[in-house]
Amino acid sequence: MTLDIPFDNTYAQLAPEFYTRQAPTPVKAPRLLAFNDALATLLGIARGTDAELAQVFGGNELPEGADPLAQLYAGHQFGTYNPQLGDGRAVLLGEVVGTDGLRRDIQLKGSGPTPYSRRGDGRAWLGPVLREYVVSEAMHALGIPTTRALAAVETGETVWREGGLPGAVLTRVASSHLRVGTFQIFAARGNTEALRSLTEYAIARHYPEAKGALGLLRAVRDAQVELVSAWMSVGFIHGVMNTDNSSIAGETIDYGPCAFMDVYHPNRVFSSIDRTGRYAYGNQPQIAVWNLAQLATALIQLEDDPESVLEEATEIVHAMPELLEDAWLRRFRAKIGLREVAEGDLELVSDLLGIMAQGQADFTNTFRGLLDGTARDQFLEPEAFDVWESRWKDRLSREADPEALMARSNPVLIPRNHRIEQMIAAAVGGDYASFERLMDALSHPFEAREDYADLRRPPAEDEVVQATFCGT
């Protein structure tokens, strides 16, 4: 008996130019590593046996109603346009409407080659699968819009990268997999009919209140403003903010070389392929604006005379930096307990970040430490913090119940890079205890639990992760 998934597919009903129908490639010996029961319940999926789940989410069996396909898109990668990308190692099984009434994609990552694989094997190895499983679910628990992880399956096959590594498949759930790059490819090809169809589909699926292409542009802008400001507030560095990784739905998507900062610095980069620092922590807001400009460039092609809407489209894009700064300040004011807006708040936040960078302070523990009185301990030379703290306490005296605001704005736990790497190393050796412990701890990131106190600690000198890798 195959798994019962209540598919209700709409993307597969679009014209064939948007995708290639592609079944996942079966694997040798699928074994279920993890299954997200709460998410499955939300999706209306009744839990089968581990063997049934492994067969379906390993790609060996197609449930009734699945209509697997690989999506086509293009994208700017580190600022350079690639005219055709597409799902090179993933297939969209289909869509479901959850018990909350929201439509979501179910996609297998690492499911084998597709016509868009570009000489790749279409597979994923265990490390990136577990990284995305842990980090995407941690982001969800932090309240940040994100794709989610439904299942992880070991394939029983070896994937060859720098050496032989255990293969795995991730089941990713997303509001959709529409990207800025999905629009770019049809605009670049001059296929206005496809671009119009895609725009109408995106509006109907994500922003039904939006009026036309510029209404969609404005809605995507506002969603990205909230998303990127949320990233900044927890020290998250996406690492590869290419336009093919910029979600129309406003979700965090593609966790390849992502990282969370330990020691704060605005220029921090982890991704091994980001050699120029294009996607550094502090650059993320301006890259979001750049990506929106690429979407605007695509969408104005829907007009017979693009120049006629260029001014309005430009205004929508040019408003984004101020919106980002406002959203950023709102989130960081909350992190230091400020509800009421007052002159000097921007300077107060900026000064704290400046002395954190100078004092090599841990990002997460400093902000949480403002609540529990341990922030000073994070600084190599705390004298500058002492001066700032005096100013802050004076400002805080005008606030009502700042502790409650700070408690829900500053996580105790984040998926620290060294803990992720340790978990992956253990899992490759067959030990999943660290994975299960991380999943449990990070599901309640704002709770200070003694049994997880070790997960709060920054890395020791020999544990520091200097670079992260896509893992593809």
UniProtKB/Swiss-Prot annotation:
Enzyme active site: 244 (proton acceptor)
Keyword tags: ATP-binding, Magnesium, Manganese, Metal-binding, Nucleotide-binding, Nucleotidyltransferase, Transferase
Protein species of origin: Ruegeria sp. (strain TM1040)
Name by which UniProt lists this protein: Protein nucleotidyltransferase YdiU
Enzyme class: transferase
Functional note: Nucleotidyltransferase involved in the post-translational modification of proteins. It can catalyze the addition of adenosine monophosphate (AMP) or uridine monophosphate (UMP) to a protein, resulting in modifications known as AMPylation and UMPylation.
Protein origin, superkingdom: Bacteria
Reported cofactor(s): Mg(2+); Mn(2+)
Molecular function GO labels: AMPylase activity; ATP binding; magnesium ion binding
Entry annotated with the keyword Ribosomal protein: no
Residue sites binding ATP per the record: 86, 88-89, 109, 121-122, 172, 179, 254
The family this protein is said to belong to: Belongs to the SELO family.
Signal peptide location: none
Binding site for Mg(2+): 245, 254
The enzyme's E.C. designation: 2.7.7.-, 2.7.7.108
Catalytic activity: L-seryl-[protein] + ATP = 3-O-(5'-adenylyl)-L-seryl-[protein] + diphosphate; L-threonyl-[protein] + ATP = 3-O-(5'-adenylyl)-L-threonyl-[protein] + diphosphate; L-tyrosyl-[protein] + ATP = O-(5'-adenylyl)-L-tyrosyl-[protein] + diphosphate; L-histidyl-[protein] + UTP = N(tele)-(5'-uridylyl)-L-histidyl-[protein] + diphosphate
